[in-house]
Amino acid sequence: MFLLLVLLTGLGGMHADLNPHKTFLQTTIPEKISSSDAKTDPEHNVVYMITIEGKPYFVHLKKQSILSSASFIHSYDKNDIRHSKPLLVQMDCNYNGYVAGIPNSLVTLSVCSGLRGTMQLKNISYGIEPMEAVSGFIHKIYEEKFADTNILLEENDTYSWFNSEYQVRKSSEKTDFIKLFPRYIEMHIVVDKNLFDYMGSDINAVTQKVIQIIGLVNTMLTQLQLTVIISSIEIWSNKNKISTTGHAEYVLLEFFEWKKDHLNFKPHQIAYLFVYRKLPTLIGATFPGQVCNKDFAAAVALYPEGLSLESYTVIIVQLLGLNLGLTYDKTDTCHCSGDVCTMTPKAVYSGGVKDFSVCSLDDFKYISSHNGLTCLQTNPLEMPTYTQRRICGNGLLEGGEECDCGNKDNCTHKLCCDALTCRLKDNAQCGSGDCCSKDCKFKPANTICRKSVDVECDFTEFCNGSYPYCLLDTYVRDGEYCDSGGAFCFQGRCRTFDKQCDDLIGRGSRGAPIFCYDEINTRGDKFGNCGTEYCLFQHILCGKLVCTWEHKDLISRPNLSVIYAHVRDQTCVSTYLPSRKPPPVASTVSKTSYYSVDDRDETFVQDGSVCGPDMYCFKMRCKHVRFLMDFETCEASIECSGHGICNNFNHCHCEKGYNPPHCKPKKEAFGSTDDGHLVPAEKSYMEEGRHAPFQKQRFQLIFYISLPVLIITTAILIKRKKLRELCYRGETESESSVSQESSSNSKSSLSESTSL
């Protein structure tokens, strides 16, 4: 596995010379004008006339997909508690396009609350943003200027990873016949604390800048027909979760470990860490050619002081290109339509349009045609469904609205939201939604906003304390067992035949045996069918709902026709709604009076019902449950540590006492990262998962080291005491002996003296 470091030398010069100056040019009032495209599809197409230095530029824009309905922003308060909310308000804001009459021009703009973004012409870039303190849709125009500099990428270090083993294709291999088609990749973006502070320490402002960066990334990737969808933005607004100092490769390896524990990854997703460095020697690090390896799909992009958003975007595009398997261009053989090619060092500090070279395009075509990008989606998942127009007063929060409390007469939060403009009133935190109180404040975190409707298959959702709406519905992943293994969870309900029959005709009616289904659903009429025709035997449990009836009196539910069949001592019943309209003329040959397999009502078996061992019904067909569940993304025994179950987002929903995302033990924790329930985050998941065992091992180590030392010390003290007693006893005996000897000598002398 190669680790690629994008090395930028001479950054002392960059600090002084490469700092791009925003040269203010003028103020202007963009004018929205009509066009044939805008008239045909005004929701997706718009045209503005923007005058710069007396010259009108006609900017044609098309709606750009950057966010999905599942995109979230995560941030941390001063207590390091994480707060999450969807990015729904930003979904309809992003556009890209071109300037009419200027070949190869590129424009990337956000159109909510004014125009904000970049216009890239041949060799010059203009920025535009609203003057928020001034009324009247006045905007300021500035030019991005880069001073000449001799800063280059250090070739030996930068290209050290690129050898014969990693060669994308042979130069003789032609790719002219290969056609590209749209692909999508989801990106988790993490912003470190230093960059958060550098960008103004404001959650909304930093979020807007990140979205602006990815919008420009997508504009530059248009040649490759590749679109980046923001899966989540996590801003470390309180403190960094890993160390972001030191060499970029070490930061990448730390981020690599962090993402394994904290991000729920899918094969088509990638994680990027945005880091601020005042004067770095490296601008990034990544694993080349590993975009489809979810274990290594990550990169670190460093943001030097003074760098423009456009230049930083180029760094990210280059890193992403390396992730995809592209290489830096050899300037003597690789050429592009513009003055600067994207995969060259010069692109970082050049204004205007940057194109991918012929070499990069050929490499990308080759990789995509040789199954190198099979993980990338060919259709965007959960992309926004656009309506023909936004409607203020329909009670739905749509793009550009700050609130929507309903119409003027039925507004749910009259003190908080202007029902005519869908704007918040003064001092209001919120103006609509289940998590917005009547006094215009967010309801406290962990307030229930949507109760579970099925004890086995549905989960309760909570307000997160920072968003006015209840989060998306969460429930047990389709295909998980319920009813003691006799049924499957599907769309948040336990799909048992008994409950379906009781709901339809009541009085304890139960699901019928298979021979009742065989008798009725092979008829091919309005009481027994699989849509437009009779059911084949393998699908008979997936057509009309057949129940048993144990009462002597007839079923008397209004507007319900009933057929009775006596089979093997069982009274089998099937029903039909006579209020149904007859089929169109083209379908009169059908005896069932149903138009298609999708033309169903409550008299049919529900999708998700059991139709055999590990088999479930879907659109009147019996299918194997393995096609319903993605065990590669979420396997409860592994991802959830055996203390949770996978939800409809393929994330773990943890038991009480276990903390998401991987269900590690933690007091009072439960739920998932999707249901809004918050747990104080003083101790991170890594601290619980790694430091706790380490602490235990440390105490064990201290104990096992201390015990022998204590025993030895005690033994020494005891020995020393005995030795001291022995010495004392010896000294006493010695003194006594000397005394006796002295006395004896005295007596002897005295005797001798007397004798003389």
Curated annotation (Swiss-Prot):
**Biological-process GO terms, alphabetical:** binding of sperm to zona pellucida; cell adhesion; male gonad development; proteolysis
- Post-translational modification comment from the UniProt entry: Subject to proteolytic processing during epididymal transit of spermatozoa.
**Bias (Low complexity):** 735-756
Report residues carrying sugar chains. Answer: 559
Mind listing the UniProt keywords for this protein, alphabetically? Disulfide bond, EGF-like domain, Glycoprotein, Membrane, Signal, Transmembrane, Transmembrane helix
Q: Where is the EGF-like domain?
A: 630-664
Which positions fall inside the Disintegrin domain? 389-478
User: Topological domain, Cytoplasmic: which ranges?
Assistant: 720-756
Q: Which residues form the propeptide?
A: 17-142
Chain ranges passing through the membrane: 699-719
What GO molecular functions are on record for this protein? metalloendopeptidase activity
- Note down the stretches annotated as region Disordered: 731-756
Q: Protein name, please? A: Disintegrin and metalloproteinase domain-containing protein 5
What organism does this protein naturally occur in?
Macaca fascicularis
What high-level taxonomic lineage is stated for the organism? Eukaryota, Metazoa, Chordata, Craniata, Vertebrata
Q: Which gene encodes it?
A: ADAM5
